[in-house]
Amino acid sequence: PSSSKYHGCVEGGLCQHCLNVYRAAQAELENIKKLGKVDINISSISEDNLIIATLLHDLCKVNYYKKAIKVFKDDATNTWHHYYSYEVEDNFPIGHGEKSVIMLQNFIKLAWNEILAIRWHMSAHDSGIATSSTERIAMYDSMTKCPLVIILQNADLFATYMMEETTDPKKENLID
């Protein structure tokens, strides 16, 4: 799954999400090119950079969720129900973007723009941004120096909220 209760909370959801992010990033890059002169250097983004950053930005979610049976109470009928869902099993508790970068670097050499884009793809949703001005400054610096950061942030948000359906596991996966 791509999450335990939001977008892509289904088997194969992470794969579909990453493909959607890639498609959204491709479209965004094409639209930027159509605008003509813009204040960012998009020529620094190769097709390989786009593929690696978009398809692998959430690598940290592989084996991060495990299947679980959960319980909820239907207040209208005052009955308890079981349903299949997912829960987090984090064996390497480090930041979301950082974890994907670290995992990837065990297998491939990442370009500097891929590292920055994957690290900061969560944007303001990254917990470190809310608590650390140093982290916030680093993210904003990355955004101004590396257009792939903004493209991945936008594509991830677009895929999540505009391309993917949020299902309710309580309704979709009801056992009893």
Give the role of each language-model region.
Residues 74, 171-174:
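A short alpha/beta connector and helix-capping loop motif
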Residues 3-12, 16-17, 23, 28, ...:
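Divalent metal-dependent catalytic cores for phosphoryl transfer on phosphate-bearing substrates
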Residues 41, 175-176:
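Short acidic DE-rich linear segments
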